[in-house]
Amino acid sequence: RTCQSQSHKFKGACFSDTNCDSVCRTENFPRGQCNQHHVERKCYCERDC
């Protein structure tokens, strides 16, 4: 199962999974990706849970 948490450090709309992933790694998550949240794309960090 994968748990997601919105990134606290990522600023602005998320268009690059690579950038999101890099920011999530600084937040001690193994990976991250952009996901649609209402009208905005946000960076979500993921880990196995």
UniProtKB/Swiss-Prot annotation:
Highest rank taxon of the organism: Eukaryota
Which keywords does this chain's UniProt record carry? Antimicrobial, Defensin, Disulfide bond, Fungicide, Plant defense
Pfam families per the UniProt record, alphabetical: Gamma-thionin (PF00304)
Q: Which GO terms describe its biological process?
A: defense response to fungus; killing of cells of another organism
Q: What this chain does, per the record?
A: Has weak antifungal activity against F.graminearum and F.verticillioides below 30 ug/ml, but not against A.consortiale B.cinerea, H.sativum, F.culmorum, C.graminicola and D.maydis.
What are the cysteine partners in each disulfide bond? 3-49, 14-34, 20-43, 24-45
The record's listing under InterPro entries reads: Defensin_plant, Scorpion_toxin-like, Scorpion_toxin-like_sf
The record's similarity note reads: Belongs to the DEFL family.
Coiled-coil residue windows: none
Q: What is this protein called?
A: Defensin Tk-AMP-D1
